[in-house]
Amino acid sequence: MNKEDLKILRKEMGMLFQGSALFDSMTVLENVMFPLDMFSKASTKERQMRAEFCLDRVNLSEAGHLYPSEISGGMMKRAAIARAIALNPKYLFCDEPNSGLDPKTSLVIDDLIHDITIEFNMTTVINTHDMNSVMNIGDNIVFIKEGVKEWQGTKEDIITSDNQALNDFIFASDLFRKVKKMEVEELKEGHKL
């Protein structure tokens, strides 16, 4: 693969890093403009308009002038999502998108990733240990243990899976084990959940 091919490939991929990876010395708007400045041939005005559109899409239109140190963790994640979609990528890769966030903010981020995936017609790949995110966002789920694909299926399949490694991971807490037992019993009785 030559440099031009790599450049094309990079334009097609949006990246959402675990720690947001915003540049501290740049405003939120400048952070979102960064991939546009690197890879877009559009005018400065067009790049700024696209960045403002992306910030508006993640409900941060009023935060463009602020620096990462001046915004919350949830706002930083949303700014990172705006940056990840700035080039209108075909693929969005997310590494632990909810790390360090409270449960309520995590749901906001999950919903945003889900909605943007559909709206921008992207394929989104999420690496996470957060089963709430898996159940909120995932359509096709792959469980990897020690670098090996252990299981693949839908979120509906998780509940009834007999894969021991998957069950050990997901149902490690008493609460989740009880929920699974109740749901499996209801499914056996013919009730739809």
Placement of each model-derived feature along the sequence:
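Conserved ABC ATPase signature
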Residues: 67-71, 75
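A short, proline-enriched helix->beta-strand linker immediately N-terminal to the Walker B motif
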Residues: 86-90
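Catalytic Walker B motif of ABC-type/P-loop ATPase nucleotide-binding domains
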Residues: 92-95
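Short coil-to-helix segment of the ABC ATPase nucleotide-binding domain corresponding to the Q-loop/switch region
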Residues: 26-34
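C-terminal boundary and immediately downstream tail of ABC-type ATPase nucleotide-binding domains
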Residues: 156-193
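Helix N-cap at the start of a conserved alpha-helix in ABC-type nucleotide-binding domains
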Residues: 103-105
